[in-house]
């Protein structure tokens, strides 16, 4: 089956076309991206601007045509935190559907976390044992822990690299004092979340997904993307600390000259590095293995599974009083309760 996955993220809109069937390795056929920076496209009231909405609609329409011309039997389109948190998200979604015919599904943060965990589990396999996964997006940080394909704990926190750059590091380069303040604040924000994640059990393997982690690993010496997805890549907390000391003194334009970081992500890589470091510190992780699969692959795998066994593509989650999304019962559902 040829599938198209359209991902409206905080930084980019990405269309991935794959050939996939249940039990098989999804084979990428094409990849098309557009940088829209939706995480920065809101006005003072928290609504997506008309200009940004216009660009989003035209991009989705263009990508939908690419999916059709590529022979996709189905286009799965989803959006994450930038659209999810916008005050006018319903209006934007309605406009996308009306003008392009694409039904854009907004994923909850914990669904992002759970679907990404599924992709990680399939990539590393059962022999990896208990896995903790970390994923840094433009608007949120996802954490998960489990021994099955459904994590026992899945969290989504509003600690994305783009969000924190805007709120904490507006200067270029960021001042040393602001970096130190953000570091301390992250330690406080992650204290309760780390306890929740670790209550499920100590990991046998710590994994990281997302472009932010891949860029950080490359900046600390990991293999380039040209080496292929199966090249082993890792990121250490010591290497991360040294990297932060280096890149936090550079301007965004200078950081963009470094191998492994794009012009689009250069402004927010310092905040991303600080989130990565704080997360690893909070979870007592020294090294994370980088997984090339993440949310898009997880959605493809869940789609194939749901068609075979009749389960829902995504399930409901709860939001706690601190604004973080948390799911502590996913593994129990996967073991028998599929309602």
Curated annotation (Swiss-Prot):
Signal peptide: none annotated. Its EC number is 3.6.1.11. Residues 315-339 are annotated as: Disordered. CDD domains: ASKHA_NBD_MtPPX1-like (cd24056). The keyword DNA-binding does not apply. Residues 319-339 have a biased composition (Basic and acidic residues). InterPro entries: ATPase_NBD, GppA/Ppx_hydrolase, Ppx_GppA_N. The keyword Transferase does not apply. Pfam families: Ppx-GppA. Keywords: Hydrolase. It is an enzyme of class 3 (hydrolase). It catalyses: [phosphate](n) + H2O = [phosphate](n-1) + phosphate + H(+). GO terms for molecular function: exopolyphosphatase activity. Degradation of inorganic polyphosphates (polyP). Releases orthophosphate processively from the ends of the polyP chain. Belongs to the GppA/Ppx family. Homodimer. This is Exopolyphosphatase 1. It comes from Mycobacterium leprae (strain TN).
